[in-house]
Amino acid sequence: MEKSSYFLFGGTNFNKKKFAPDFAKFKNSTEDDDSNKKVNFFVEEEEDTEQPEAEKVIVSSKKRKRRSSNSVPVEGFDVFKSSKKARAKGKAEEQITKNEIVENPKKELNRQMERDALSRKQYSIHVSGNNIPPPLKSFAELSSRYGCEGYILRNLAELGFKEPTPIQRQAIPILLSGRECFACAPTGSGKTFAFICPMLIKLKRPSTDGIRAVILSPARELAAQTAREGKKLIKGSNFHIRLMTKPLVKTADFSKLWCDVLISTPMRLKRAIKAKKIDLSKVEYLVLDESDKLFEQSLLKQIDCVVKACSNPSIIRSLFSATLPDSVEELARSIMHDAVRVIIGRKNTASETVKQKLVFAGSEEGKLLALRQSFAESLNPPVLIFVQSKERAKELYDELKCENIRAGVIHSDLPPGERENAVDQFRAGEKWVLIATDVIARGMDFKGINCVINYDFPDSASAYIHRIGRSGRAGRSGEAITFYTEQDVPFLRNIANTMMSSGCEVPSWIMSLKKKKWRKHRPRRDSISTKPKADKNDTDE
């Protein structure tokens, strides 16, 4: 066989007899000049210049050496390698995308939590609890986030609310998210709208199925005021807000009475429950306004009766007050589930917009003289004066009547009509001075009270905060003067601490007094009169 044929068939055992016709075709075919060239599939094409015969290596099919890693890759193999790289790269990118999808919500959640924390810090909002909703940025969010009806936003605008107050920013989203809460915010900070607004949004539309919301207030005056404020907010809707009055308890058929929101004092509501005149099983919202007063020992049985009557398993309870003692907080947690705690500013502190001062009067006679002197120097009505009891309210009223001062008086012995008349005259400016007991210190909103005078030393820090809170409401400035006598000195330190926490200056000697364990400070006081004691004794004889 020729050399070229040998190369072609080298390493094979070809049966020439069996494949004779085919072999003849190959042998007789015309061969090109290039056919004599050696074919090598494992090295690059030889250059045109012929190399010596010795340098031409014939690679045996039995012993094929693997190509070194430095050799140029075959095009076909390189394509497969690049496709593997592409697949590996694609998988890596896919994994990164999946990780980003998982991480992005976490990052966004963390950013949102940071924004919420900054907003709360800006408005001195302190919260504790789980999964707390973000505070409101504006009232417009009530529509975008919660589907608030237009009439509520219109009424808020007409009432002069441009931006939510701090308590409204946080309490409204909490209640709208279906959570229970107890909130402590300074007097005059808009707590009433903070619980009525979400109540109306969640109730959505009026219903004839019975009472769906109950608001409890410790005093009739506060209940009446809450009803007035609520009716301002439902203007333009078909909601019905009713105040529980004495005639209503006696004569009303609550099964036929159209009432969405009922506002009452605990005693009146308890009477209606005991008489089986009212069904509270469908109540969706229960609000305890001025809850620290409602949880006092004298009202606990009444509150317990109302709470049991509101038996709806999905009811949402909320507590609002200007002060939140630890004992009240503990009781609140016993009737609430997974509640959020909201504190605006510092807990149990007076409003920072009220200028506070202590005045030593020495004795009961000295207090009356100090009051007359303050009126002579600068009577800047309207002025609210607080005394310890209804007897002392009557005595002070008799004294001021003789001074030709346009004064009114309100206490629990007066019939409801006279009490309402006294409050209305004071609001209208017909009376410059209103003498009151602590019954009116809770939540009553008198626009523009310039001065509060604690004629009798308050019996607790909580009472002090609520009293002076009638002034300096809704960001206005005000003044609070507290008279004290020798028998009040042991309790000065407690009030001084409250004053300091709201930024007021207190004499150093008062802060050096021993801090006394606080109890109700209601000393027996002499009657209010300008007559000297000797003259009083002569008159008695």
Swiss-Prot record:
PROSITE patterns: HELICASE_ATP_BIND_1, HELICASE_CTER, Q_MOTIF. Residues 525-541 have a biased composition (Basic and acidic residues). Its EC number is 3.6.4.13. Residues 370-514 form the Helicase C-terminal domain. Disulfide bonds: none annotated. SUPFAM superfamilies: P-loop containing nucleoside triphosphate hydrolases. One of its GO terms (biological process) is maturation of SSU-rRNA. A motif (DEAD box) lies at residues 289-292. It catalyses: ATP + H2O = ADP + phosphate + H(+). A motif (Q motif) lies at residues 141-169. ATP binds at residues 185-192. InterPro entries: DDX52/Rok1_DEADc, DEAD/DEAH_box_helicase_dom, DEAD_box_RNA_helicase, Helicase_ATP-bd, Helicase_C-like, P-loop_NTPase, RNA_helicase_DEAD_Q_motif. GO terms for molecular function: ATP binding; ATP hydrolysis activity; RNA binding; RNA helicase activity. The keyword Cell inner membrane does not apply. Belongs to the DEAD box helicase family. DDX52/ROK1 subfamily. This is DEAD-box ATP-dependent RNA helicase 57. It comes from Arabidopsis thaliana (Mouse-ear cress).
